[in-house]
Amino acid sequence: MANIIKVRDDYEPIQFESTSGLNKFKICEGSSASWTDQEFTVKDLRSRIEPWLTSLFQSEHLSLLVGAGLTHAVHYLAANKAAAGMSALDLNNYKDEIDNRAKESAEKAGRKEGNLEDQLRVANELLRGLEILGDSKADNLRDELNGGMKDFAQSILSSENGIVTANEDKREQAFNTLVTFLMSFASRIGVRERLNIFTTNYDRLIEAGAEIAGLHLLDRFLGNLMPIFRSSRLDLDMHYNPPGIRGEPRYLEGVARYTKLHGSVDWVQTDRDIRRIGLPFGATDITPFFQTPSLYGATAHELMIYPNAAKDRETAGYPYVELFRDFASAVCRPNSVLVTYGYSFGDEHINRTIRDMLTIPSTHLVVISYDDPLDRIMQIYNEMGRPSQISLMIGAELADLTKLTQNYLPKAAIDKTTFRMSELLKQRMDPMQSDKEHKKQETTASDTGLEEL
């Protein structure tokens, strides 16, 4: 697959591919670029991409949307294979009806085939209808759904476990790359608004990376032993008092707001509340962690994995309505930048919000993706019709996690030494550039004088 780049003042996406030389590329037939000849190197790409991303990352409002691509990338670095995917539910009751309806739902959302989430949505709707009718088949379907949810949770845990149990050197390299990735976005000076991290993933990979990096994540949960999900959105933050200065708290650096749009493998509905249970990263089985009196005999069917909403009738869609509202309020603002990594644009809720965001002229969308097998990203790009507000980095040469962090993402540092060095280099380079321009003008003038003689 060819790589696609569109940054800065590129009018349209540019396709390029590798040549026989190491780290050398050429423009594909049918594409053209004003900033390079037919062939160029990684150094040329870096000088094109890195300053652009650096300026975008220091915008007034910055949000990062992470999809399954990040989990697969880190898992591949650690275990040399992709993470477990979402396999279809194995049902005996109403299998054909559920599969057909799930496929219809997927096609309406612009996807060719239904996935596990589509099946869960349809199966839960059917189960609710059978319960209303008092049909005896409701018990059988509920048992099958419970087993399917347990298998799905098990596949999520196996992906986490695959990273934890990988070779120590590879595991350390994978987590170091993840930390560099996260801190490239989170390294914002304290007076800027906090980075907003959104993810559609159910695993806890970002939480693990943030813990290693020392990055504080603020979410809607309150408490320590079994944090409870709060419906009210309180803009809590972290501050510190500088030594010797009282009454002037300053923002603590290394803080980000975190939202899991599709729920998490460790969120469980308990009676009227949603709680986050103490499920260790890399655990092999979730069942033992349900064996506590405070969970009221919960099973895998009570896991908050989208679209498995809370079961009381008056809050259909809870807590996902609140989570999607957080996403919309964070990105649909002037001077807002949204960066997506590993997101395939398969969720119409999210796509609709992104479309609304781009109606604000000062917003910008950066799409970073390892591939686009269904051509969904380019289809969305063309449908939105706002090329000047969208940057694209698609392909293994641009979006491979190691190459991305080493070559293209901004340096994950906001220390004063870095800023002082940048200013010093700028001051030194300006006089040098002026001298070069002055000498060039003198040479041109003398050549012109000789020609006149």
Model-derived features: where do they sit?
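Gly/serine-rich nucleotide phosphate-binding loop at the start of the catalytic core
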Residues: 1-210, 216-217
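Flexible internal linker/loop segments at domain or repeat junctions
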Residues: 282-325, 330
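Short, glycine/serine-rich, charged loops/turns that create anion-binding
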Residues: 69-70, 202, 263-265, 345, ...
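A short acidic (Asp/Glu
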Residues: 73-79, 205-211, 270-272, 348-354, ...
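Short beta-strand/turn micro-motifs composed of small residues
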Residues: 66, 199, 262, 367-369
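Extended, H/D-rich, highly charged conserved domains that either
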Residues: 80-82, 107-142, 187-303
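SIR2/sirtuin-family catalytic core signature
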Residues: 1-64, 110, 114, 248, ...
